[in-house]
Structures are given as C-alpha cells and as structure tokens.
Amino acid sequence: MNNLIVEQANFIDGKRKYLICTNHKGMALIQPILEKLLSKNYSFDFVFIGFDSTPEQTKNNLKTWLQNQKMGSYLYLALSKEELKNLRPLIEEIGFFEDEVQYVGYGEMHSKVFCCRCHSLTQLKNLEIGSEMKCQNCHILLLVSDYYSTLYDAYLGNIANL
C-alpha cells in the first residue's frame, strides 16, 4: 500500500469526470488539482469529509457516492495515510482500479513486515522499501522487499545477511 500513496497529487488529463474526496487537512494537498479542473472547466464532483464523521459513516457515504458514478471517472482521495489504507479495499470492491485512483496522503502510516523465517508479522511506522529491520519474534535482520501480500496486509521481509 505504501507505494500507492503519494504525498503530492498529479493531474491526469482526459478523463470523463473527476471525483474528489478530502478532509480539512487533505484540502491543501488537493488544491492544485481543484485549480486545474476549474481553469480547464472540467466536470467534477467534490465530497468533503467533516470532523464529526465516524469511520463507518465515511465508508457508507463514500460507497453510496462512488457506486453511483459512471465509468471513465477518475478519483482523487486526499486523507490521512491510515484512512487511505482502510478505505482502499472498499474502493477496489466498488470497482475502481489502481490506474483510476490517486491516494494522496499525509501523516504516518503503520505497515507490517512478514518474516520469511518465522512467519510472524512486525509492525513499523513509515516503512521504507529496501530498508533493514529486525523481526520482533526471531530477531533476525530482514531486508524489506517491495513484494506486498494482500492476504497478510504486509510486505515480505527477506533475510538480509546470509
């Protein structure tokens, strides 16, 4: 999931319609996209997630909104990295593929690394692909690979020194 979240939104031209979903903190990240859409007079829908929205309300409202969109729409989500991580399965379930969505995130994200030796999961903050870390169970030094398992919701950690 780390490799899908960007910290700066990139404008993708030529889409049928643009969908923007953000909260107060994500607004600054998505502002350049809004300005481009307005200057080009492109069609877009905008959904703002307020402070008083619970995660369950957010999921239900987002699901209803996205299910009513037409094919050819492009989605920008500008939320905290943890919120993006939690919403991604819902977005994919609705039918948006990786090339139809930009996850623009802020803040820290907790990721897991799967140890190839003892098969335990170690949780880390702001994981970097290619970095080394110790397994919390067997204490072996692992090299974090870019292979991500959706089954375990974790990156594969290979033995760093043989």
Question: What is the predicted function of each stretch?
Answer:
Residues 1-111:
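FNR/FR-type flavoprotein reductase catalytic core
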Residues 85, 89-162:
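Cys/His-clustered metal-coordination modules, chiefly Zn-binding fingers
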